[in-house]
Swiss-Prot record:
Descriptive protein name: Copper-exporting P-type ATPase
Gene3D superfamilies in alphabetical order: 3.30.70.100, Calcium-transporting ATPase, cytoplasmic domain N, Calcium-transporting ATPase, cytoplasmic transduction domain A, HAD superfamily/HAD-like
Oligomer status and interactors: Monomer at sub-stoichiometric copper concentrations. Homodimer at higher copper concentrations. Forms a heterodimer (electrostatic interactions) with CopZ during the transfer of Cu(+).
Positions of Cu(+) 1 binding: 16, 19
Lineage: Bacteria, Bacillati, Bacillota, Bacilli, Bacillales
Miscellaneous comment text of the record: The copZA operon is activated by CueR and indirectly repressed by YfmP.
GO function term, MF aspect, one: ATP hydrolysis activity
Length: 802
């Protein structure tokens, strides 16, 4: 079996959860497909398949055969370098082999190619790179039919259909008021009561406006299933057909005919269209987080090509291109500064409002803002490989994934419509044969009400819209959930295990204390200690040097250096003999240091690493270095405790140092002296105690523990491997994000339960009420139209969480 692949596709044409279930079932039956996940709210399909047995084209064809449409983008290119038809053939074959490309016909005569591709799998830069390798050049003409444009076009179409339907339905609604005693005083033009006039108004609504429902119903029935389209088409057709029968019966009579239901079918369709339009707009708002992230992306870049500056679309930037960035511009790609100095606003990544200084050799992140200087940047990551693209991809995957809680809704949705059809038929028979014997009008009215009040959409949207809104809002806080499953599991956590270095602490030692002794001043102590450390590459030595430089002190030139493993340094600088190290070093070199031991032990009790310093054989004092806790750690730990969580710090440090750091951070429980390879075992031990555990870390040695924990959280300032292993990435490196993630998970799960309760409760109560005859069909239709809207609007409340 070859290595499996995963493909994501945008699918249009789904109207309810039954549609999503049908596509999912159809895809899972395909040879070579091992799993398929179809999400109604995001209108996406994620398929895992064996490329040896099937491919993108076959999967797309299957979705089309089921009666739905895979949304693709088209990009038209001019081709440079073709000399014959064989060139065109080579380019066409190469483009069609790219994952996500549906079709790429090359026109040799016009020297153009129009590529139809899945934007979730391929990009313009992928297409260009593939053709570049063949020795040709693609030049973008312009893209059409993007997903956003297609959705706007569909929204405009829905609005136009709604207006057309409302204009024709209004006279029918006006005529309907004459049916009720309490509205009989309202004047109604006689023409509106004429059955043939009502027929003329209702027919375009039924067959022009209602046509998509007929098409959807036909496709569903052809595939031996049923969906909301079947219910709407059947219910409105029953009302229309019965009214048409009575209209023909009225031939030869004068005036209006009682018992017509033209207004029922027309108003039903109008209300359903109104509900669908609201739903579309609300669902669009649920992906606001993605839109905000995409707006951060630069649209163009200034590059040097053939010795000249050129402004090109961002998709055309290649790795190793030199990009010019002026003050105030967004940096278009991830790269390295090769020339220039500036301050860069990285708040979109780190959440920090203060700009960060950038010099030659420093890395920069695409979509951050160059504040005040001119920069030349060498492109390192472009297109879908940039940090922002990765963030967008993670959010999209999370919004398109299913949470385990959705399984119940999926199971119900799969059998919902057939059950409703059965109840509707039974309702008709009971009313026609028993409740109102022989009264066809009464029975058909109850039959229609049952059909149109049932709403599988509300059930299908209950979970995914909340997942979309919750994960999207979390992303705005710098919290990236890798999927709906992790968003759900996070709310069950009761224990948070924090790695010390880089998580609770800054991960970078700094000079904290300098205590001179005897005739020496602090300046002497620091200058000569730093001079000795210039020959060392130890992080503690680097911390001393950085601290001395920050104080503006000059460091004498080192003339001799010798490292004593496990003890310290022997050095000469500025004509002085210097020792920097442990008690053991001072004892071996016979330097009297007893008067410093009490202070040394005090500092060590605070979790600091203390080094004794001697100059020319005389104790000069001591310097202390510590990996200090982050400014936000204490507050973050307090927030976690307020949420009812048990907080544990895990570290490889000795217990004394660990206790000092834990005390400063407000952490009561510690696991100290743990080797990197033992961290996962400690997590497993906590799980055996019945704890739902999260591990939070930032380093390579945290990866096994992150994978073992129920939820692994990676601090975004850490290593790529930790972030790859984790279920949640906290891109701001702030421990407060842990509490935010847990709170967001709890609020999202609460929102999902509210939605499921509403959707299940609505259908459980609405269908019997309609069957008992307490609802007119048009009222039932209005309830159905707005039930799914209410679910989406409730989910959107998550976007306002602060």
């Amino acid at each position: 079996m070859s290595e499996q692949k995963e493909i994501a596709m945008q699918v249009s044409g789904m109207t309810c959860a039954a549609c999503a279930a049908r596509i999912e079932k159809g895809l899972k039956r395909m040879p070579g497909v091992t799993d398929a996940n179809v999400n109604l709210a995001t209108e996406t399909s994620n398929v895992i398949y064996d490329p040896a047995e099937t491919g993108t084209a076959a999967i797309q064809e299957k979705i089309e055969k089921l009666g739905y449409h895979v949304v693709t983008e088209k990009a038209e290119f001019d081709i440079e370098g073709m000399t014959c038809a064989a060139c065109a053939n080579r380019i066409e074959k190469r483009l069609n082999k790219i994952e996500g490309v549906a079709n790429a016909p090359v026109n040799f005569a016009l020297e153009t190619v129009t590529v139809e591709y899945n934007p979730k799998e391929a990009s313009v830069s992928d297409l260009k790179e593939a053709v570049d390798k063949l020795g040709y050049k693609l030049k973008l003409k312009g893209e059409q039919d993007s997903e956003a444009a297609a959705k706007k076009k569909e929204e405009r179409k829905q609005t136009a259909r709604l207006i057309f339907s409302a204009v024709l339905s209004f006279p029918l609604l006006w005529a309907m008021v004459s049916h009720f005693t309490f509205t009989s005083f309202i004047w109604v033009p006689d023409i509106f009561l004429n059955p043939w006039m009502q027929f003329a108004l209702a027919t375009p609504v039924q067959f022009l406006i209602g046509w998509p429902f007929y098409v959807g119903a036909y496709k569903a029935l052809r595939n031996k299933s049923a969906n909301m389209d079947v219910l709407v088409a059947l219910g409105t057709t029953a009302a229309y057909a019965y009214s048409l029968y009575l209209t023909f019966q009225s031939i030869g009579s004068h005036g209006h005919t009682d018992g017509l239901y033209y207004e029922t079918s027309a108003i039903l369709l109008t209300l359903i269209l109104l509900g669908k339009l609201f739903e579309t707009k609300a669902k669009g708002r649920s992906s606001d987080a993605i839109k905000k992230l995409m707006k951060l992306q630069a649209k163009t870049a200034t590059v040097v090509r053939d010795g000249q500056e050129q402004i090109i679309p961002i998709d055309e930037v290649l790795v190793n291109d030199i990009v010019y960035v002026k003050p105030g511009e967004r940096i278009p790609v991830d790269g390295e500064v090769v020339e220039g100095r500036s301050a860069v606003d990285e708040s979109m990544i780190t959440g920090e409002s203060l700009p960060v200084d950038k010099n030659p050799g420093d890395s920069v992140t695409g979509s951050t803002v160059n504040a005040n200087g001119f920069l030349k940047i060498k492109a390192v990551n472009v297109g879908k490989d940039t940090a922002l693209s990765h963030i967008i991809k993670i959010v999209e995957e999370a919004q398109g994934s299913k949470a385990p809680i959705q399984r119940l809704a999926d199971q119900i949705s799969g059998i919902f419509v057939p059950i409703v059809l059965g109840i509707a038929v039974l309702t008709f028979l009971i009313w026609y044969l028993w409740a109102a014997p022989g009264d066809f009008a009464e029975a058909i009215s109850k039959f229609i009400a049952v059909l149109v009040i049932a709403c599988p959409c509300a059930l299908g949207l209950a979970t995914p819209t909340s997942i979309m809104a919750g994960s999207g809002r979390a992303a705005e806080f710098g919290i990236l959930f890798k999927g709906g499953e992790h968003l759900e599991k996070t709310h069950r956590l009761d224990t948070i295990v924090l790695d010390k270095t880089g998580t609770v602490t800054n991960g970078k030692p700094r000079l904290t204390d300098a205590i001179p002794f005897g005739r020496f001043e602090e300046k002497d102590l620091l200058q000569f200690a730093a001079a000795a450390e210039t020959g060392s590459e130890h992080p503690l030595g680097e911390a001393i040097i950085a601290g001395v430089k920050d104080k503006g002190l000059e460091i004498p030139k080192l003339t001799r250096f010798e490292a004593k493993v496990g003890a310290g340094i022997l050095a000469e600088a500025g004509g002085k003999s210097i020792l920097v190290g442990t008690r053991k070093l001072m004892e071996s070199e016979q330097v009297e240091h007893g008067a410093l031991l009490a202070q040394m032990e005090e500092l060590e009790a605070e979790g600091k690493t203390v080094m004794l310093v001697s100059i020319d054989g005389e104790a000069a004092g001591l310097v202390a270095v510590a990996d200090t806790i982050k400014d936000t750690s204490r507050k973050a730990v307090a927030r976690l405790k307020e949420l009812g969580l048990d907080v544990i710090m895990m570290t490889g440090d000795n217990r004394r140092t660990a206790e000092a750091i834990a005390k400063e951070a407000g952490i009561a429980n510690i696991i100290a002296e743990v080797l990197p390879e033992q961290k996962a075992a400690e997590i497993a031990r906590l799980q055996k105690e019945g704890r739902q555990t999260a591990m939070v870390g930032d380093g390579i040695n945290d990866a096994p523990a992150l994978a073992t924990a129920d939820i692994g959280m990676a601090i975004g300032t850490g290593t790529d491997i930790a972030m790859e292993t984790a279920d949640i990435t906290l891109i701001r490196g702030d421990l407060n994000s842990i509490a935010d993630a847990i709170r967001m998970s709890r609020l999202t799960m609460k929102n999902i339960k509210q939605n499921l309760f509403w959707a299940l409760g609505y259908n459980s109560l609405g269908i019997p009420i309609a069957a008992l005859g307490f609802l007119a069909p048009w009222i039932a239709g209005a309830a159905m139209a707005f039930s799914s809207v209410s679910v989406v609007l409730n989910a959107l409340r998550l976007q306002k969480v602060k």
